[in-house]
Regions:
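Hydrophobic, well-ordered secondary-structure segments
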Residues: 102, 106, 134-141
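A short hydrophobic beta-strand->loop->alpha-helix junction that borders the nucleotide-binding pocket
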Residues: 154-158
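Short, surface-exposed linear patches
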Residues: 84-86, 113, 147-148
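Post-Walker A helix-loop "phosphate-sensing" segment adjacent to the P-loop in P-loop NTPases
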Residues: 142-153
């Protein structure tokens, strides 16, 4: 059964409209069945609209179009499968176990970069292994793609 407009989702997807799985190499977002059955666009993600001058145009479905676009953006970001559980910047990170530099990076990523995007140009995380840099990067990418519709690409240089 499909939900409408702002209340898109169900208990299966925790009202997000998508579920995350891990394929062989990459995390993968898939539309929840509550979205696939959208009554507004019949699953296409688009509706026919008309502007104030009477011209018809194709627009994203107000009920599921944004979710469909954001799922595609998440899937092309190339997030490693082992991070499929990380859907927000601070997911699973414990402040008390982090050094002060990583705490500042987390605060910057969450409070400055994600919330104020695109006014910030980006950031680079450097340091020894095991600090949580990849976790922080994946969380940032997940939030930007799934919640804000921003095109991102995960790149591991090593």
């Amino acid at each position: 059964m499909a939900k409408k407009t702002e209340s898109t989702g169900c208990d299966t997807c925790h009202w997000s409209g998508f579920v995350i799985t891990d394929s062989a190499s990459y995390a993968r977002a898939e539309l929840c069945s509550c979205i696939e059955e959208c009554p507004h666009c019949e699953g296409s993600g688009n509706i026919l609209s008309e502007n104030e001058n009477g011209y018809s145009y194709v627009a994203p479905c107000h009920s599921c179009g944004v979710i469909r676009r954001n799922v595609k953006l998440y899937n092309i970001a190339g997030i490693p499968a082992k991070y499929s559980h990380v859907l927000q910047v601070d997911a699973g990170l414990e402040l008390k176990r982090m050094n002060s530099s990583l705490q500042r990076a987390l605060k910057y990523a969450k409070d400055e970069f994600v919330k104020k995007y695109p006014t910030k140009d980006g950031f680079l995380l450097m340091g020894p292994s095991g600090l949580g840099k990849t976790h922080l990067a994946v969380g940032t990418i997940s939030e930007l793609t799934l919640k804000h519709g921003v095109k991102c690409l995960f790149k591991d240089f090593f």
